[in-house]
Amino acid sequence: MFFSVYVLEEAGVHQFVFLSSMSVYGVDQGPLDPMTTPEPKSNYGKSKLQAEEGITALRDESFAVAVLRPPMVYGPGCKGNYRSLQKIAKIAPVFPDYENIRSMISMENLADFVKQTLDTRADGLFCPQDPEYVCTCRMIRDIAGENGKNLPLLKVLNPAVVLAKKFTGMGRKAFSDLYYTKSQGNEGQNGEA
């Protein structure tokens, strides 16, 4: 680590912004905030937390470290979970009308948050998110609509969602409430962006 700090100082770097993930918390439901204890379950979440720990060890009075833990990122060209939702929206003839709340962030809003973090030389842990929560079924319906498809939402399918949430990780991931609290959504432990 000493070599890394020395190289950064010699290059005139005074801040590091690390894009981590909500995955460090290791949960698939519930409200979260920057004070929630990380307990990653996946290799992805574990690797993000290890990187956070290594990078924050570089923090000192002349070197700011901002760790951003965004929720699912959506927008053109996004991969991962958002791409899975796009595929479902394209092929599903109907979808459950099941209410849930999720934190998400658009690529544009995340880019703006990163810029603001750099512009203010913010230091700390941040959980950026869009101003409004998202409901999975409404999002899938909207994605279908963007592709010229009318996707009916049916409450009669909701018992299947309850079973899927109880017995499958995919069901919990898609339909559980998983969100950052609004009071803590964009605030850091060591500062604000």
Residue ranges and their predicted role:
Residues F2, G45, L49-T56, D112:
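Conserved active-site helix of classical SDR/Rossmann-fold NAD(P)-dependent CH-OH oxidoreductases
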Residues F3-N43, L58, F63-A66:
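Conserved Rossmann-fold NAD(P)-dependent oxidoreductase catalytic core, especially the SDR/UDP-sugar
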Residues V17-F18, A66-M72, S103, C127:
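Structural signature of the Rossmann-like NAD(P)-dependent dehydrogenase/reductase core
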Residues K41-E52, M72-G75, K79, S103-I105, ...:
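Short-chain dehydrogenase/reductase
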Residues E53-P76:
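Conserved beta-loop-beta element that borders a ligand/cofactor-binding pocket
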Residues K87-I105, N109, C127:
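A conserved pocket-lining segment of Rossmann-fold NAD(P)-dependent short-chain dehydrogenase/reductase
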Residues M104, N109, R172-A193:
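Short linear elements at protein peripheries
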Residues F113-K173:
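Mid/C-terminal beta-alpha module of Rossmann-like enzyme folds, strongest
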